[in-house]
């Protein structure tokens, strides 16, 4: 949907415009020295995709990063790094954070790793939000998102860099349930991934159709507009609730829905006492009976 808001070419504010706004913020009496987010929909993608784009515009039938990065892509973060350094150098500024909008697929195309180093050293406030959105490959294809392997590659690179610089910082991934193309099997696959990576999301996002997006076209038509092939869509509220519950299977309130989803998905092997199971065989642990004594005795 960003294409309809911004056009097919990445739109960026000039460094001068951003610095001018930062200077206004600094003058505020309540300013404590922290610029909370120099991000956006595509925070680190400020540079033209390639030299060809500068000459003839964007490609009509190709995307820069999906389904795989174009060989011509020029992943250059020098402009962004320069901007961040200028912001850090402003009098009165203690920290400049990037809290959202990092395109990790674009970041991983960088050859020298300068931006990842700069990001981890100066611009993460303990946690960095990123948006893999799912991990099942068929769902990611319908989303137009990079594959699970790209996400895991970034997770490893982020962890390695933080070890090198002696910092303890974390990634907060954002996932979506019930996206077009996401079956109950895919939802269970995501739940297992959350289990294996020790994730316990407090907030999850159920897919909401919004005007102007390919995902919404799939949701209402049941077809992929790019291939013409049928796409499974979750329309039933109860089915949507089951997919959402699987993402928060540790929440006791979701046990009944998770149990139903696992049975319907043919994954009763994930119900039991084993460490890999999502829920226990019984919904509630048996509690020892207590004998209440009268106050008079």
Each language-model region and where it sits:
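Radical SAM enzyme core and accessory elements
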Residues: 211-297
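Radical SAM enzyme [4Fe-4S]-AdoMet core and its adjacent flexible, acidic
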Residues: 49-78, 142-143, 148-149, 195, ...
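Catalytic cores of alpha/beta
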Residues: 114-115, 179-196
């Amino acid at each position: 949907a960003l294409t309809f808001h911004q056009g097919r070419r990445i739109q960026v504010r000039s460094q001068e415009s951003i610095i001018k706004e930062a200077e206004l913020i600094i003058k505020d009496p309540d300013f404590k020295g922290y610029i909370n987010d120099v991000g956006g929909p595509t925070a680190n993608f400020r540079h033209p995709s390639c030299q060809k784009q500068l000459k003839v515009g964007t490609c009509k039938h190709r995307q820069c990063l999906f389904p795989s990065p174009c060989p011509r892509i020029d992943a250059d973060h020098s402009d962004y790094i320069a901007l961040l350094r200028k912001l850090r150098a402003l009098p009165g500024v203690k920290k400049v954070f990037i809290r959202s909008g990092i395109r990790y697929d674009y970041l991983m195309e960088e050859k020298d790793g300068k931006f990842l180093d700069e990001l981890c050293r100066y611009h993460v406030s303990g946690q960095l939000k990123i948006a893999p959105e799912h991990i099942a490959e068929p769902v990611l294809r319908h989303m137009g998102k990079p594959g699970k392997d790209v996400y895991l590659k970034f997770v490893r690179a982020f962890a390695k860099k933080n070890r090198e610089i002696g910092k303890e910082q974390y990634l907060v991934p954002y996932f979506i349930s019930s996206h077009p193309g996401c079956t109950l099997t895919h939802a269970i696959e995501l739940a297992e991934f959350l289990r294996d990576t020790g994730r316990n999301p407090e907030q999850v996002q159920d897919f909401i159709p919004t005007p102007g997006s390919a995902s919404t076209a799939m949701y209402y038509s049941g077809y992929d507009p790019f291939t013409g092939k049928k796409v499974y869509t979750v329309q039933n509220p109860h089915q949507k609730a089951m997919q959402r519950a699987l993402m928060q299977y540790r929440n006791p309130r979701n046990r009944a829905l998770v149990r139903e989803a696992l049975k319907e998905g043919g994954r009763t092997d994930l119900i039991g006492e084993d460490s890999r199971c999502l829920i226990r065989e019984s919904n509630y642990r048996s509690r020892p009976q207590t004998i209440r004594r009268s106050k008079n005795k």
